[in-house]
Every structure is written in C-alpha cells, then in structure tokens.
C-alpha cells in the first residue's frame, strides 16, 4: 500500500505520488493541505501512451515515482519496468486550481537504469538514476537532459556507488546550505533497507558520505514494529520545516517467515538540520513521533482538514470517487 513515496509542495498544497506496479490507473496521486489527511486523486497514467502495462507481470510495471514542480508545471518521472523505459509525464493545474491536467504524450529518456529523479537548476534539467556500470556494479548516475525532448546533453556520469550496501538506488538530489545532497537507498527493499546520504560542492560531485551513515534504518533493531525503512524523499512545509517521507513495513513473522499484510507503507518524519547534515526524528524510525520534541513542525500540522467520506457498492458503471 503506497510504496516509494515522493512529495512536492505547491503553495499551501502537498502532492504525493506512489508506485502502482502492474495496475491501472498507474502512478497513485494524493493531495493534502495539512500533511496528515490525504485525498486520493485520479491516477496519473491512464492510457497506453502514458504507460503500456499490458505485458507487466506481478511487481513489474510502474515503480519508483518522483514528483517535482517547476515554472508552472508538474513533472512526474518514473520507470515502467514492463517496457524498461524511463519517462516524464507533465501536468498543470486547471483554471480554478482544483485538478491537475496530465498530458498524454510522455517524454522518454534514453537511460539504462531505474528509479529516476528530477532536479531543476538555472533553467537546466538533471536526471539521477540507478543502473549498472562496467563490471556489473550498481551506481547512482546522472545525466543532463533537454526537458522538452528528453534528449541527453551530458552523461551518464557516476555520482556514487553508495556505502557498500547492496542495491544502491532511489536517488534524490537537493540543495541546502550552498551544497548538494544526494539521498539514496541501500540494502534492498527487505530487512537490510536503509537511507544514506552524500554531500558534494558540485552537482556532478564528488560526493562524500555522511559520517553517520546509514542516516535512517531499523536494520539492526529487529524489535522495532517498523522495518524495511528506505526509499526516501525530502521536502519543506509551508513554514520552512524539513520533512522526510519514506517507505516502511509493519511485518509479522509466521513460521519464521516475515509477512507484511499491508505491504510497503508511506511514512512521514520531521527533519532537523545540524550544521552540515540532516537528523531525521532524532535518528530513530519510530512507529509514533512525539511532536512535543518538534514544536516548529507541529505548527504546520495545527489545522487539520476534514475529508469527505464515500461508500461504493460497485453496482454502477462509475466508481466513487471519480
């Protein structure tokens, strides 16, 4: 349920996307005004032109979605593993600002990898992704693209091989305090999952690992109810506070087999920056967050919205909500 979260804020509204794998409509989209209550919006990829899922097997299709906003447009970038293609779908708010209109024509990017991320700077567009390099090793790589066409202008170039954990992936780039920060996931999406971070003075590196890596994980705390913490994204609220969203599971063990009935879920944690590095929820991926420890963050959650409820008995041709 709602894995691989990515969140962007536009004005006072937060938009979140999640992976949907082999199911239509592809790319789950939700909206919130308070970060606590989320309204599900129509899925983004609803046509074959946007994402052809006809050959997708279980757990293939759309995964590792990222949403960004730049110069009046939403940009959602993702991988369709069934086609093994990476692409962008562009959208914009309608006239009364109540819905996003998504373009049917996607922008394909010719990279050999998965988990793409978008970063905009000085009217230039950069894509970070994970893929294999010579020797069969996985690495976070980067290309500069022409946004309208997806054509590659520079790269791919390696940014990081991670900290040594398996399957370095899920990259996101952000700029803070005059430096570039590369967020990544390592260890696979199972029990070894962890969030790591790297810092560079240039967008093209070199990137140095945080001294406290892994930045956020429960891989060595098997007693914690939340496990498999990883695949994170960072964003700011309306008051300028930083937050981290990531995936996690609440597993049960039956006959020595770990079972997650709700799959990978979306989690949200407050972030505080030290002089150089972010600290996520005091460093602990806890099931609950004591907001008394984060008075500035709690102010952003002080006006919860009321969401309408609905019931559908599946007796008509259309489903509620539309």
For each of these PLM feature ranges, what is it?
Residues 1-322:
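Carbohydrate-active catalytic/glycan-binding domains of CAZyme proteins
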């Amino acid at each position: 349920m709602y894995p691989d979260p990515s969140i962007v804020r536009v004005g006072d509204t937060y938009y979140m996307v999640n992976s949907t794998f082999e199911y239509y409509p592809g790319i789950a989209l939700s909206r919130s005004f308070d970060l606590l209550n989320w309204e599900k919006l129509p899925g983004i990829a609803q046509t074959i032109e946007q994402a052809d899922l006809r050959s997708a097997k279980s757990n293939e299709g759309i995964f590792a979605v990222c949403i960004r906003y730049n110069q009046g447009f939403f940009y959602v970038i993702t991988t369709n593993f069934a086609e093994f293609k990476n692409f962008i779908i562009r959208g914009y708010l309608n006239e009364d600002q109540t819905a996003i209109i998504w373009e049917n024509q996607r922008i394909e990017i010719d990279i050999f990898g998965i988990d793409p991320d978008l970063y905009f700077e000085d009217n230039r567009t950069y894509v970070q992704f994970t893929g294999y390099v010579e020797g069969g090793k996985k690495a976070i790589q980067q290309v500069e693209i022409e946004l309208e066409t997806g054509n590659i202008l520079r790269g791919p170039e390696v940014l990081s091989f991670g900290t040594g954990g398996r399957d370095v992936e899920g990259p996101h780039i952000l700029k803070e305090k005059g430096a570039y920060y590369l967020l990544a996931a390592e260890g696979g999406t199972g029990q070894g999952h962890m969030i790591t971070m790297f810092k560079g003075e240039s967008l093209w590196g070199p990137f140095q690992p945080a001294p406290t890596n892994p930045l956020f994980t429960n891989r060595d705390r098997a007693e914690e109810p939340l496990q498999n913490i990883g695949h994170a994204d960072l964003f700011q609220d309306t008051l300028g506070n930083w937050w981290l969203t990531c995936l996690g599971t609440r597993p049960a063990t039956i006959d020595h087999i770990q079972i997650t009935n709700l799959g990978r879920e979306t989690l949200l944690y407050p972030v505080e920056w030290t002089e150089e590095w972010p600290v996520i929820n005091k460093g602990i991926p806890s099931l609950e967050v004591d907001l008394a420890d984060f008075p500035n963050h709690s102010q952003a959650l002080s006006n919860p919205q009321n969401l309408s409820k609905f019931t559908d008995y599946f007796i008509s041709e259309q489903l509620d909500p539309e």
